[in-house]
Amino acid sequence: MEQLLKVENLRVSYHSYAGKVQSVRGVSFEVNKGETVAVVGESGCGKSVTSKAIMGLIQCPPGEIKEGSHIYFENQDLLSFQEKQWEKYRGAECSMIFQDALTSLNPTMNIGNQIIENITNHKNVTKLEAKKEAIRLLELVGIPEPAARIKQYPHELSGGMRQRVMIAIALACNPKLLIADEPTTALDVTIQAQIIDLIKQLQQKLGTSVILITHDLGVVADIAHRIVVMYSGKVVEQGSSEDIFYRPKHPYTWALLKAVPRLDLQNKQQLVSIEGMPPDLITPPVGCPFAERCPHTMKICQTTPPPTYHFEDGHEASCWLHHPQCRKENLPFVAGGGQECQK
């Protein structure tokens, strides 16, 4: 597949009163045209900061993108852009669906004008043509009676409807890349499923590449082609959805999968959780970031960052357990164990 986006050694820090927070520490991954890539991990792992860097939304100060970081979009290094180039890129080439539609939409403008504004900023069309396009977009995302809804304000819509409006705004200029940052936040389970299904249908219909940011592996099971697992500002594993769900190679990925609630739990059986807390990113650990919480940690994990080991079909993981000299008995997530994690 043809490459659309390449993130290479991305490092982002934020200056605070307590010190410099190293939010993203050497993140690298790719997105191909027409592909959906999910970026998953716990809160604070750097998922949203990575997406903001791709959109050019890191404010400096307090944010800082470190030298040596690169983000290539169609072979152009976005980090060399001037502000006018960013303005042309945002919305037209790459759009973003933000976490909370209620706070992301302008409460003083009706939803029609908010969509029209995005269209007229990037396309040479009249306001009447933009209004017709706005109605078409509302219909596309499944909002009934779009000609009437276009006059309504955000507070007059339900949470699910507001999120559909956010998707319509993001798709207004037919971008090549759509970033969905926790698009199901604050929505009930049935509406979550509808929004994820809508994004999947639109991706297939329009051929748009999608980056889906989430902490819930259950959300990405049926939509993502590839999954990038982040922890403590780093990518610890990435591969196809099938590899991540059935052949995970990193203890953190395995722990995330074990923590997904199952429908076949016995009565009063406790849910699985990951013990401990993520490390402080003001003073991140020198070795593996997951070492303090990992049940299989070794001495080398505490002192030396693990290399990235490559497996079949682009599957890779950063874990010392894959070193040729490491014993691998009873490790269900290590290749050769013959066991699979249930989806």
Could you say what each language-model-derived stretch is?
Residues 152-157, 161:
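Conserved ABC ATPase signature
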Residues 73, 77, 128-148, 258:
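Conserved ABC ATPase "signature" region
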Residues 77-95, 121, 243-248, 279-285:
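ABC ATPase NBD coupling module
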Residues 3, 147, 240-343:
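Short catalytic/signature loops enriched in Gly
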Residues 179, 183, 187-269:
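P-loop NTP-binding/switch modules centered on Walker-like glycine-rich loops
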Residues 1-4, 13-26, 57-64, 82-85, ...:
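A short, flexible loop at the N-terminus of ABC-type nucleotide-binding domains that lies
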Residues 172-176:
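A short, proline-enriched helix->beta-strand linker immediately N-terminal to the Walker B motif
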